From Swiss-Prot:
This is Phenylalanine--tRNA ligase beta subunit. Mg(2+) binds at D454, D460, E463, E464. PROSITE patterns: B5 (PS51483), FDX_ACB (PS51447), TRBD (PS50886). One of its GO terms (biological process) is phenylalanyl-tRNA aminoacylation. It comes from Gloeobacter violaceus (strain ATCC 29082 / PCC 7421). The keyword Cell membrane does not apply.
Amino acid sequence: MRVSFNWLQEYVEFDFTPSELAEKLTMAGFEVEHVEDRRTWAAGVVVGRVLECAPHPQADRLHVCRVDIGTGRLLNIVCGAPNARAGIYAPVAPVGTYLPIKDLKLRAASIRGMPSEGMLCSLEELGLEKASEGIHIFPEASLPLGLDVGPLLGLDDAILEVASTANRADALSMVGIAREVAALTGGILRLPLVDAPLVPRGDLAARIAEPEACPVYTATLLEEVAVGPAPDWLRERLEKAGMRPINNVVDVTNYVLLEWGQPLHAFDADRLAAGTLGVRFAHKGEQLVTLDGTERPLTPANLLITAGERPVALAGVMGGEATEVGGQTRRIVLEAAIFDPPAIRRSARVFALRTEASARYERGVDASALEHALGRALQLLADCAGARAVVQATDDYRRRENRVVSLRPERLAQILGEDIPDAEIARVLKNLGFDVQTGPQEFAVTVPGHRLRDIEREIDLIEEVARVVGYDRFAPTLPPPADGGYLPFEDFIERRVRSLCQGAGLTEVVTYSLAPDRDQQPVVLSNPLSAELNSLRTNLIDGLLEILRFNRSQGNMPFHAFEVGVVFLRSDEGIFESGRLGAVMCGEPAVGDWQKLTPPFDWFAAKGVLAAILQPWQIEVEYQADRRDERLHPGRTASLWVSGERLGTLGQLHPRLASRLDLPEQTFVFEIDLDFLIDLVRERPVEFRSFSPFPPAARDLSFYAREALTVFEFERLIREQGEPLLESVALLDEFKGQGVPEGCRSLAFRMVYRSDHTLTEEEITAVHQRVRQALAERYSVDLRS
């Protein structure tokens, strides 16, 4: 928007130059893209009177003028303008004057043998017209000679080209910019007074068919209208704003649009069809010739103004040619309305027709200022066109909104990094037009109508305070030194588990958390993305097998992978998540292993991988035969138990499932409860044991035992009885067959003893004998050594 510096100073007092004001507005969020300082355009140009004007003796189209500029000495000026004559007052640029528009500095010259000491200026040379046919002649009968022409031509002004953001519709008006300047400078705001006449109701009728698209519509009939040129001051302000003056009626509507941001439209009342003025969407097949002479086919998306059901204007965008105000107009109907931004945006976009009115309606116009802007227009029409308001009709569906937003000074200080006194916060908001009720902990801030479009939350008010106070006030500060960060215990253990899995040769993968509905207690989605993936997974193994299947089809073997993720389970209390660690291992020999160095991957190799992952936590895990999972081999599956609670499952893929999935039978999987593992690690006390520099002593122990007894049971008993000298125990051998009693197997264990001194044979024998006796008593083993 082009903002006149002088016009702005009528509404708010401030003591800044145009450049200083531009800097303040830019820092407050209203970027001033350019300052057009017109005061330099006619610097040194003065009022002069042409006393004599004679033809040039050497040129037919030139005149030799004698000009008085009040210095006591007449200037001899050669001029080629056809309208130069004696007795006129004109702008004169004496020798030494610089005209920036033409980049011309006047020097004394000789033109066709006649001396010339300056120039009689046209408006083109002063930057006020693109092309001029002659010099500018002041209409006044008498003017002081030597007077600066700047104030006479409106060149004592500066134009600020202000760019506003899309959420600040109020900034597309002089009143809106004046409010901002008053808040930024602390100046006194003096908005134009409105002394509009009271207009009675009467025969005129208005009806809104689409209240959502048009909340309020007011039509005012004015008579005794004298259409003609607008006053010079009004025309000058429109020209500075980039608008072309047309006539006093249209110019007044444009002036109010610039002043208040409220678009208005005037219809020739005698050219309107009889009937009610209405607002509705277009019917299919309707057409309208707009003011630019273009016939436009309408669609049901176009909002219209109608008279007697005939379209007369494209609402909020452009009026119709048939009801245009012209020189013969004596009665007008003045429209003032609020339109829904999306409705106007659609019409403007469809017809590629962006007008000053549509630009404001698209952003949202202040509905609370409608009557004020209309009153201002009626006042100016009475002054500039002699119009008399006769009757008025209004259809109003507006919902009066009283928005109150809470603002906490403590939160403001937290966001901005600086404590601002409560009194200053209140002053800034009041200067912006907000009503502020202060409290001990927070302010209750009532949002004015012109800011309802962009002030909705507390953070919006904080932004207002920050930009008015000035962003440069908040000095950059380094944050205080922070303590060293650390991961939550759960994240630390999870990262450690991932690292251990990678160290064991497993590759991390991520599978879908959605799965087919094939479990016994699935968590079925009410609105799934697909019928195939309609529930949440209850285990990780199914997804890992699909990953293995895909990679095997691509030739990516051997394949050893793991996943850390959550599964979704049901209980009596509802649905809950559980963290899990799952893995799949398929050890087919790699392609190119001609020496057969890669051993086949068996159950014990898979168990070794799992043991390597669990070993750092020093958790005693009991492996029990398990047949419950139908996906796994019934004779090669074990459940993992710790202190009587299930930790997970390790097993080989069932041959039938392996065949169905086209996978090798030597495929092994495990899944453990990661949440349970984290709890075990958390509860386990950290104990320090110093390394013993003394030599160990190894003893072997073999015996026959019933097949029903597990190795874990023997290892657990050996550890219990071997304390505190026993360092480790490991299975050396297992044998079944000839020489072994029926229903039994031969087991051999190696036990390593160590202490903080060199063990004697007596110490070792005593502990070793205690272990032998405990095995015989508890499990009735037949000791062989």
